[in-house]
């Protein structure tokens, strides 16, 4: 022993003379001390050796050597190589980390780092192991750098996760530029080692870097944080998960980078309010926020969610988007929720609170029974963005102790709303306000756009198509701006279960044959047209108040003699001939200037009612320009055409 100690002091002398690095090896761990930072060294009773504040049991030391390697302060490097892992610990943080290595299973307990110039420790992970893990515990901020890592945890030692940070503070997860990485957890851990995700952070996780991280959750979630998650620059690919692809509490923020999700057994991105902390709602700069909100400011999110009643993105609070590109499809059917006594269904985007979209591009597709594009329990506000939604599922309903499906509303009309889920493009319980952006919603069954509250449209380009009401509001509907096309093949174009007022904007409403109409307000409520540019196929409901003059196309202006339900020109009359020609472009003019070019559908209600704020004229057979919108049903320019005969429409000439 005396000879080993003398050898050590000889090495120490060499280090101090040549400014080299002193390396102390214990098992698979190397502690690297730069000469300038070795500090005081003591040997106690020939049993322990203290270097730079790190106490070593001499019997645990395998080797001490000197080399010319450079040491990066505050860094711990872990290299996986098959069934083994080797660690290098920078000397300045050696007193604050306690590693344990079993094969390729690595555990590190981190203690106070406040004495290390106030800096945090960075753990750099690289290499490959088909049976390994990284587990870190502590109470201080740290960074995890993933730099060419492929890790699968087959036989857990410390946790079933591939990467587990049992640390309630902020953890940076940096995926290094140009690297492709893979994390896979254990599919069947023991109960005491059962993990919450393949990549789990107890605190808040901030993902960054410009590399790619692939994650597969074989037991529960793929990625999970006990607090918030932010994503910036890096690419996260969830290739499979038994439960959610990404799960967190407090809030989720997508700033840049990309997330792709497939093969998940529940939701794509799930954000909950942390029940162990006080709920705060949204806060400035998200400081101390516990809202359950999902924020999208930039980046790309793609997801294919197939599970029953699953959500592409599900916020316990609000959903707020100001940018980015989101493409999500859901295909799962409905299920009965016995706890809440209701039928649940899938949705591409779902929020228990408000939904606010001011920018970004959204392509949402739902094909499962009862599925929706966007579903919210609060208010729904769109001021910008480009949103495309397609839903094609049937109705999911609970009867006779099981979930069934149907495409007929008559089958479920006697069931309470809790016992059925109807597929809709957008459905919200609170007020809806649309003032900007582009919204294109097509629903094969049931409403394309529906709010249980009021609907206020002041701007934006909106196209809604459905076999049910194209746009429906439970409360007052007001249109004072925007460019709106509501096209129903089986019901009303616009339908309010209260008063409905059109006082501005451009509106093209298409209703089905009798008894449906183009624009409809609730019985004993009032439809008022006081401004804007209006086209209504199927006409207006009986008793409409038209303070701006409306006109109806004369039957002599059409080449079609077929009957198509509603028509006639006397109060309450029905069953007259259709006054317009199908699949034909018309031009609506105000004071001689084109206000709107519109294409008629293949079928619809008999009457065609028009109105503008000036002297109104109509042409048939115009040639539309290339500047089409509304899914090819509207255009801003047109040429040619033949004048059509229109006659004044009065409130007495109702179509209902």
Language model: regions and residue ranges:
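Sec/Tat signal peptide C-region and signal peptidase I cleavage site
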Residues: 15-19
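A composition-driven surface/loop motif
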Residues: 69-656
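Compositionally biased alpha-helical segments
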Residues: 20-70
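Sec-dependent N-terminal signal peptides
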Residues: 4-14
């Amino acid at each position: 022993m005396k000879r080993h100690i003398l050898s050590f002091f000889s090495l120490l002398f060499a280090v101090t003379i040549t400014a080299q690095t002193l390396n102390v090896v214990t098992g698979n761990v190397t502690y690297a001390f730069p000469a300038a930072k070795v500090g005081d060294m003591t040997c106690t009773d020939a049993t322990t050796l203290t270097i730079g504040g790190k106490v070593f049991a001499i019997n645990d030391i395998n080797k001490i050597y000197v080399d010319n390697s450079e040491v990066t302060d505050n860094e711990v490097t872990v290299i996986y190589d098959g069934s083994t892992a080797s660690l290098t610990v920078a000397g300045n943080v050696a007193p604050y980390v306690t590693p344990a290595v079993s094969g390729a299973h690595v555990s590190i307990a981190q203690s106070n780092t406040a004495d290390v110039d106030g800096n945090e420790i960075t753990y750099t992970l690289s290499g490959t192991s088909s049976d390994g893990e990284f587990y870190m515990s502590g109470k201080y901020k740290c960074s995890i750098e993933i730099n060419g890592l492929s890790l699968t945890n087959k036989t857990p030692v410390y946790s079933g996760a591939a990467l587990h940070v049992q640390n309630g503070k902020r953890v940076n997860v940096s995926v290094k530029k140009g690297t492709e990485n893979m994390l896979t957890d254990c599919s069947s851990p023991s109960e005491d080692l059962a993990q919450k995700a393949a990549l789990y952070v107890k605190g808040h996780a901030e993902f960054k870097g410009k590399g790619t991280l692939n994650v597969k959750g074989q037991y529960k979630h793929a990625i999970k944080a006990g607090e918030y998650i932010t994503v910036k620059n890096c690419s996260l690919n969830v290739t499979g998960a038994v439960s959610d692809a990404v799960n967190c509490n407090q809030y989720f923020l997508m700033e840049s980078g990309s997330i792709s999700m497939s093969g998940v057994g529940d939701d794509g991105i799930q954000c909950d309010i942390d029940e162990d902390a006080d709920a705060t709602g949204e806060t400035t700069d998200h400081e101390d926020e516990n809202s359950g909100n999902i924020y999208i400011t930039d980046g790309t999110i793609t997801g294919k969610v197939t599970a029953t009643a699953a959500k592409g993105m599900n916020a316990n609070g609000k959903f707020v988007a100001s940018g980015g590109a989101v493409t999500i499809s859901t295909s799962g059917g409905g299920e009965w929720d016995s706890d809440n006594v209701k039928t649940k269904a899938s949705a591409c985007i779902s929020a228990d609170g408000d939904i606010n979209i001011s920018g970004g591009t959204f392509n949402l597709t739902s094909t499962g029974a009862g599925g929706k594009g966007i579903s919210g329990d609060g208010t729904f506000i769109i001021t910008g963005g480009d949103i495309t939604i397609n839903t094609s599922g049937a109705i999911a309903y609970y009867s006779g102790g099981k979930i069934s499906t149907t495409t007929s509303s008559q089958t479920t009309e006697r069931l309470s709303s809790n016992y059925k889920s109807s597929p809709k493009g957008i459905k919200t319980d609170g007020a809806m306000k649309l003032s900007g952006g582009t919204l294109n919603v097509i629903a094969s069954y049931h409403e394309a756009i529906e709010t249980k509250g009021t609907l206020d449209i002041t701007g934006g380009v909106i196209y809604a198509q459905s076999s049910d009401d194209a746009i429906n509001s439970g409360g007052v509907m007001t249109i004072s701006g925007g460019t709106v096309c509501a096209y129903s093949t089986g019901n009303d174009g616009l339908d309010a279960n209260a008063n409905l007022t059109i006082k501005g904007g451009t509106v093209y409403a298409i209703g089905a044959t009798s008894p449906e109409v183009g624009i409809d307000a609730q019985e004993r409520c009032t439809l008022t047209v006081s401004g804007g540019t209006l086209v209504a196929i199927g006409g207006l409901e009986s008793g409409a108040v038209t303070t701006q003059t409306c006109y109806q196309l004369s039957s002599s202006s059409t080449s079609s003699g077929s009957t198509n339900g509603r028509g006639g020109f006397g109060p309450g009359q029905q069953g007259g001939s259709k006054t317009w020609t199908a699949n034909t472009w018309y031009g609506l003019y105000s004071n001689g200037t084109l206000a709107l070019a519109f294409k008629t559908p293949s079928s619809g209600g008999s009457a065609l009612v028009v109105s503008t704020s000036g002297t109104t004229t109509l042409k048939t057979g115009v040639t539309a320009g290339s500047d089409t919108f509304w899914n090819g049903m509207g255009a801003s320019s047109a040429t040619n055409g033949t004048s059509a005969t229109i006659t004044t429409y009065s409130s007495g000439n109702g179509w209902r």
